[in-house]
Structures are given as C-alpha cells and as structure tokens.
C-alpha cells in the first residue's frame, strides 16, 4: 500500500500557504485565531 503523505512544496503552499489563507474570510479567521494564540508560524 502506498503511503498517504507524498510531500510536494508546490501543493503545500497552494493549499495551506499564507496567500491562500488571506483569500477567503474563513482563512483570515484562521490567521487571526493563530495570531491571538501567539503562534510563531501563522501559515506554512
């Protein structure tokens, strides 16, 4: 059986990157929540 996680930098950035998070209202909510929590890294 093939492993499920096959890393790819491109796909990682396109699906979980900062700019993608900024696009939608929900994504911005995620970033704000992470800021409030004091996360060092907001997005990938």
From Swiss-Prot:
Keywords: Ribonucleoprotein, Ribosomal protein. One of its GO terms (biological process) is translation. The keyword Ribosomal protein applies. GO terms for cellular component: ribonucleoprotein complex; ribosome. GO terms for molecular function: structural constituent of ribosome. It holds the Pfam family Ribosomal_L34. Belongs to the bacterial ribosomal protein bL34 family. This is Large ribosomal subunit protein bL34. It comes from Bordetella avium (strain 197N). The gene is rpmH.
């Amino acid at each position: 059986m093939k492993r499920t996680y096959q890393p790819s930098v491109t796909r990682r950035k396109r699906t979980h990157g900062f700019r993608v998070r900024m696009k939608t209202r929900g994504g911005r909510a995620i970033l704000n929540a992470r800021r409030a929590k004091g996360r060092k890294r907001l997005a990938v």
